């Protein structure tokens, strides 16, 4: 267990930027704005569920 934990910590210390952010290849650089918004899209569906329930009076 300790070995796995230390391996994870070591890898995240060696490659800190690759954990959360990755650069797109140059051919897809024009898609950067879309890729930046993509993680937020599921939240829109979550909010849409509340709007829908409000529209039907939370039946």
Curated annotation (Swiss-Prot):
The answer to whether the entry has keyword Membrane is: yes
Q: Which residues cross the membrane?
A: 38-58
- Spell out the protein name for this chain: Photosystem II reaction center protein K
Q: Which residues form the propeptide?
A: 1-22
Q: Which family does it belong to?
A: Belongs to the PsbK family.
Primary location: plastid
Please report the record's description of how this protein sits within the membrane: Single-pass membrane protein
Q: What does this protein do?
A: One of the components of the core complex of photosystem II (PSII). PSII is a light-driven water:plastoquinone oxidoreductase that uses light energy to abstract electrons from H(2)O, generating O(2) and a proton gradient subsequently used for ATP formation. It consists of a core antenna complex that captures photons, and an electron transfer chain that converts photonic excitation into a charge separation.
- PANTHER family, per the entry: PHOTOSYSTEM II REACTION CENTER PROTEIN K, PTHR35325
Q: Provide the protein's localization.
A: Plastid, Chloroplast thylakoid membrane
Q: Which gene encodes it?
A: psbK
Q: What InterPro entries does the record tag this protein with?
A: PSII_PsbK, PSII_PsbK_sf
Q: Does the keyword Cell inner membrane apply?
A: no
Whom does it interact with, and what assembly results?
PSII is composed of 1 copy each of membrane proteins PsbA, PsbB, PsbC, PsbD, PsbE, PsbF, PsbH, PsbI, PsbJ, PsbK, PsbL, PsbM, PsbT, PsbX, PsbY, PsbZ, Psb30/Ycf12, at least 3 peripheral proteins of the oxygen-evolving complex and a large number of cofactors. It forms dimeric complexes.
* Organism (species): Helianthus annuus (Common sunflower)
**Which GO CC annotations does the UniProt entry carry?**
chloroplast thylakoid membrane; photosystem II reaction center
An example of a Pfam family matching this protein is PsbK
Q: What are the alphabetically sorted keywords of the record?
A: Chloroplast, Membrane, Photosynthesis, Photosystem II, Plastid, Reaction center, Thylakoid, Transmembrane, Transmembrane helix
What SUPFAM superfamilies is this protein classified in?
Answer: Photosystem II reaction center protein K, PsbK (SSF161037)
Q: Which GO terms describe its biological process?
A: photosynthesis
